[in-house]
């Protein structure tokens, strides 16, 4: 199974973590609880009539750790490329196969890797949220600053995760189940 580091613990990062961990991949999510979700009150998230952003985050974190993802409250200080991606915090480094960046409106790590940007400074991505650097995905406000919504970011994270699952499987992957019979 692949190893994946996700920098950012908003809806995009946690959605990607859910899909990947649920399917047996080794996932570490880095976040310092500075997501804009802490200031949100959601009325427009399908399936949830309304919820405070902090409650949403608490539920989402519990869900992803329930599937085996690891949450780290350490800030990522740098990312390098060496037999994969070396993700460094103040106290440790890990090497992973894939990197998903959900850095918000200031994509410092994406820029440090030299990924392509458009004329507005948004990180250029394809429809699967792949950046110009192989195995680096950028989701959320960094890629779509004009479309910053929790549900859009969650969909972007899911899209990136499904692309990684497909690459690892060697064919398209769908992640859904039928309800238990009974």
Give names to the regions the model predicted.
Residues 72-84:
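A conserved short coil-to-beta-strand element within the FAD-binding core of flavoproteins
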């Amino acid at each position: 199974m692949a190893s994946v580091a996700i920098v950012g613990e908003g809806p995009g990062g946690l959605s990607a973590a859910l899909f990947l961990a649920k399917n047996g991949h080794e996932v570490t999510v880095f976040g310092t609880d500075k997501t804009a979700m802490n200031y949100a009150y959601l009325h427009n998230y399908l399936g949830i009539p309304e919820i405070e952003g902090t409650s949403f985050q608490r539920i989402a974190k519990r869900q992803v750790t329930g599937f085996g993802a690891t949450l780290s409250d350490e800030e990522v200080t740098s990312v390098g490329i060496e037999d994969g991606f070396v993700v460094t915090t103040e106290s440790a480094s890990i090497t992973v196969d894939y990197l998903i960046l959900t850095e918000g409106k200031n994509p410092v790590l994406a820029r440090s890797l030299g990924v392509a940007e458009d004329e507005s400074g948004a990180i250029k991505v394809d429809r699967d949220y792949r950046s110009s650097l192989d195995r680096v995905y950028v989701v959320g406000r960094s890629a779509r600053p004009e479309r910053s919504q929790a549900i859009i970011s969650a969909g972007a994270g899911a899209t990136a995760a499904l692309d990684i699952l497909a690459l690892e499987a060697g064919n398209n992957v769908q992640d859904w189940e039928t309800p238990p019979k009974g």
